[in-house]
Swiss-Prot record:
Species name: Plecturocebus moloch
Subunit structure: Homodimer, and heterodimer with OIP5/MIS18B. Identified in a complex containing MIS18A, OIP5/MIS18B, MIS18BP1, RBBP7 and RBBP4.
Cross-link (Glycyl lysine isopeptide (Lys-Gly) (interchain with G-Cter in SUMO2)): 162
Main subcellular localisation: nucleus
Keywords on record: Cell cycle, Cell division, Centromere, Chromosome, Isopeptide bond, Metal-binding, Mitosis, Nucleus, Phosphoprotein, Ubl conjugation, Zinc
Coiled-coil annotated spans: none
Binding site for Zn(2+): 85, 88, 141, 144
Its biological purpose: Required for recruitment of CENPA to centromeres and normal chromosome segregation during mitosis.
Residues with Phosphoserine modification: 36, 39-40, 233
A GO CC term assigned to this protein in UniProt: chromatin
GO molecular function, one term: metal ion binding
Record lineage: Eukaryota, Metazoa, Chordata, Craniata, Vertebrata
Protein name: Protein Mis18-alpha
Any single biological process term in GO: chromosome segregation
Record domain Mis18: where: 80-178
Length: 233
């Protein structure tokens, strides 16, 4: 009898255990419940961890892409400028010899220029405001003879930083960023339409139109003959 009661207690005593196993059974039930709760919490924790890792990976990818774009933008900003003559687009110099720019005189100052810039040896005094005492030599483009600006040969003490610098008028200069061109060679199967191809296409369309008109006339003649034969019969 005792063995049977003991067996009943092991298999699931509720509240009427007569042999002192009531507390043990309750402890077992609480333990199972806590284990179940811990398992649920563990699963939830794993789920959150997975979501966090996914979010972190997405953020890492986004940060990597952002860094790449910032590097590309920085590289674009560091690309040198080539200054071209606005008349014939010959290169006059580049930003590697850049010194400064002056908004009041609307010009840029370079340490050196290309061989496309000729210097007139005839010297003259500057007539610009605040440049009294400056001796200038005129700059011209060797290609189109456009007046590009001046080179300062003699300056007062307060303008010593301009001496032997080439002052190019902004209106006479255009700029080009090295590496900014994205033009690619077009393959034969993707060749763009030009004037000759357009003429050929228009010619082919005209021939097709003439053929269609001739077929329409023949069809009209056949229909007329059939209609006449029907009326006669």
């Amino acid at each position: 009898m005792a063995g049977a009661l003991s067996l009943r207690c092991r298999t699931g005593c509720t509240g009427g255990c007569e042999y002192g196993h009531k507390g043990k059974c309750r402890d077992s039930s609480l333990l199972s419940k806590r284990l179940s709760e811990d398992s649920s919490r563990h699963q939830l924790l794993q789920k959150w961890t997975s979501m966090w890792r996914s979010t972190s990976e997405d953020a890492s990818v986004a940060d990597t892409e952002k860094a790449r774009l910032e590097e590309a933008a920085a590289a674009a900003e560091e690309r040198p400028l080539v200054f071209l003559c606005s008349g014939c687009r010959r290169p006059l110099g580049d930003s590697l010899s850049w010194v400064t720019s002056q908004e009041d005189t609307n010009c840029i100052l370079l340490r050196c220029v290309s061989c496309n810039v000729s210097v007139d040896k005839e010297q003259k005094l500057s007539k610009r405001e605040k440049e009294n005492g400056c001796i200038l030599e005129t700059l011209h483009c060797t290609g189109c003879s456009l007046n590009l600006g001046y080179v300062y040969r003699c300056t007062p003490k307060n303008l010593d930083y301009k001496r032997d610098l080439f002052c190019l008028n902004v209106e006479a200069v255009e700029s080009y960023v090295l590496g900014s061109s994205e033009k690619q060679i077009v393959s034969e199967d993707k060749e763009l339409f030009n004037l000759e191809s357009r003429v050929e296409i228009e010619k082919s369309l005209k021939q097709m139109e003439d053929v269609l008109q001739a077929l329409q006339m023949k069809l009209w003649e056949v229909e007329s003959k059939l209609s006449f034969a029907t009326c006669k019969s």
